[in-house]
Amino acid sequence: MASPGGQGGGAVSTRGAGARRMKWALELSLGNARGRGDRQSNQGDVMYPIGYSDKPVPDTSIQETDKNLVEKRCWDVALGPLKQIPMNLFIMYMSGNTISIFPIMMVCMMAWRPIQALMSMSATFKLLENSNQQWLQGLVYSVGNLLGSALAIYKCQSMGLLPTHSSDWLAFIEPPQRMEIMGGGMVL
């Protein structure tokens, strides 16, 4: 510390016309002034501030944040198939019920994605192993994929691709006749 008498080297500063003012300074190094190269060689000479500890303190807030991020990521994976259902409904509406290449391609993709996700479920569950709610997340993931498959089956049925009448299996039964045929607001 600089002495109050003004003999502390840089402790006294002069301003203006002879006005002397005292500056207080606290030197944390016990030795003389050293260069940068000397700092690493004499580490024992340094006085640390009050409350300083050389031991690393584990940061529990990072571990807590990591657990929350893992839970959030697992729920994102589990809810992924359910988030695709509104888009699939929109695609079903836009593709129509006619049998052509575009609607059939949409139905194939709608059916293949959930089946592929259900077949690779073990790889998905490896990601969910760190979660506390693994079983609930797995159930939500399975239900979402089953709903996606059900939408594809419904679209196939509405297009007339599923064998739902007995005439589809038996050759001697006549197919059902349409009672009324309409097209574009005109009677045919």
Swiss-Prot record:
GO cellular component, one term: endoplasmic reticulum membrane
Keyword Endoplasmic reticulum set for record: yes
Domain of life according to the entry: Eukaryota
Membrane topology (UniProt): Multi-pass membrane protein
Residues on Lumenal side: 93-103, 154-188
Keyword terms of this UniProt record: Endoplasmic reticulum, Membrane, Transmembrane, Transmembrane helix
Subcellular location(s) per record: Endoplasmic reticulum membrane
Bilayer-spanning residue ranges: 72-92, 104-125, 133-153
InterPro entries listed in its UniProt record: TMEM85/Emc4
Cytoplasmic side: 1-71, 126-132
Main subcellular location: endoplasmic reticulum
Biological process per Gene Ontology, one example term: tail-anchored membrane protein insertion into ER membrane
Assembly mode: Component of the ER membrane protein complex (EMC).
Membership in a protein family: Belongs to the EMC4 family.
Biological role stated in the UniProt entry: Part of the endoplasmic reticulum membrane protein complex (EMC) that enables the energy-independent insertion into endoplasmic reticulum membranes of newly synthesized membrane proteins. Preferentially accommodates proteins with transmembrane domains that are weakly hydrophobic or contain destabilizing features such as charged and aromatic residues. Involved in the cotranslational insertion of multi-pass membrane proteins in which stop-transfer membrane-anchor sequences become ER membrane spanning helices.
Protein name, UniProt field: ER membrane protein complex subunit 4
Name of the gene this protein is made from: emc4
